[in-house]
């Protein structure tokens, strides 16, 4: 079995992968450097590859994505019909939640404003700040990342509720969980609204003018899920009017965010370029490698894959 590894692995990671499939042939490269010949010869691909390259596959058994998202691979015929597809849901909870938590807390403490003053050599007091202690936090998308984020907020004394499509099963860190029908009521109560929702027909454009108007005056909004949740002009309007105290996003639509986007200059807006879920935190890559190794074992044993995706 030829196993094409596109992940930026180190020696320890290689040992983990190779011990999960002893005697098999491992080829290590990167997504950018992988050739059509390597892809054509692969029985297993570990990592994300340009979907157009998959047309070269001749006997692919498994495409194990390094990302939690997989939208680019769902179009009919993208992944060979006989191949299995799996993702890395569960690998990014720590990294993304810590990043978004830091963004929210920095907004609540006016740190971006103080950074601007520092660059201008100005010693000024920007006034009152807010706290997560006793704050009402609403998490949209109560999966792995949302659960990690809720844990961080609870550690600061916040009250955390969640919204998810199937609210009957959820991490115990949430004090309560509702379905989407309760969204307007919960938005009106929350001091912080943080979204980690995937991109679906139901979520695209969900954060629009009505959404922001329903939010509590002076609340904060954060998006670490998918950029197409937000109608950018409506978010800008909510910030410019002062209805929202601030917003923090690590995802936008489109990406990269055009230089002409009004989001760049919106007041009390903090933007990072979709980097919270990359491999900047070593633990994230460790998690991805562990999932890949587990699925190599499952594949050889004919067992159900972890994070299996129907396509």
Which residue stretches match the model-derived regions?
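N-terminal glycine-/charge-rich "phosphate-binding" loop or analogous flexible N-terminal tail
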Residues: 1-44
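Oxidoreductase and adenylate-handling cofactor-binding alpha/beta cores
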Residues: 97-113, 155-158, 290-301
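Phosphate/diphosphate ligand-binding glycine-rich loop within oxidoreductases
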Residues: 41-115, 129
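Short acidic low-complexity segments
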Residues: 29-38, 51-54, 173-189
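Rossmann-like dinucleotide-binding domain for NAD(H)/NADP(H)
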Residues: 218, 224-311
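Rossmann-like adenosine-cofactor binding region
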Residues: 167-262
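NAD(P)-binding Rossmann-fold cofactor-contacting core
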Residues: 155-173
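Glycine-rich NAD(P)-binding loop of Rossmann-like domains
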Residues: 114-148
